[in-house]
Amino acid sequence: MAALLDRVSGTVSPSFFFQNMWLVLITAPNSRIPALNSLARRLPKMESEDSQSSTGTPFRPCLGGGPSRTPLGDRALTPPLDHPPLAGVAHIAGEDIGLMIRGFAAALEDSQILVQRGILDLLTTTLKIDSQAFKATRWADQILLMRAVTGVVLRRDLSLSRRLYSWLLGPSDNSDVQIAYLKEHSLELLRVALKAEMDEQSTESVDRQRPFKIFISLLDKWEIGHSLTEVLVLDAFAALQVSLRPDDHDEVSRIDPASIRA
């Protein structure tokens, strides 16, 4: 499969090839691992803002990208207006960058940890959260990806959690630098994504509990949990009060109070 993909990639344009790779991630679960192997070799890195500003790399308009209001009905979901709707990624991902985001999000829902790990590796190496390519995507697509990415903490797998933390906190090992990176690039999107999911009125108990479990799991990483608690805890309790139903009581009672106090 990998050899076939390599031959195909050499005969078509990059944008056409990668568009079909995103479709493979969405529609062909059994082919995700070969697709990820090919993407890991061929997908160019999309530099961070600092790297782009220092090198003067030009950006091209990205059709369908850029901030926009979403149909989620929350003014808080409107993105900051200082993100330029430009990115040098249209020739890679194609005109619909949202297709790339949806491909990543679909693969992150895969039951195989190897697939989830491969997507997180791609995100941390080629689509960093501080890159112009990521910030040029639609706000709704950013939220979609954030919801899918944060869901990996529910697997309780250290390799997945470590990659998630790296994407949210940046490449530095210094806690102060990580917190500064989180507040500048990740925190607001993380807050909005979790709050939107908390406010959804799902009929399924598992779906209603999911964002709260993610919130509690993220508290395990102090650099994330401390800042996230400051901006989300009141909204979380308000949403919990609205959405809690009798059949949820047993699940809530099993939550460790120490994790909340942390």
Regions of interest found by a model, annotated:
Residues M1-T27, S31-D50, P58, G64-A262:
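Structural marker for long, regular alpha helices in very large eukaryotic proteins
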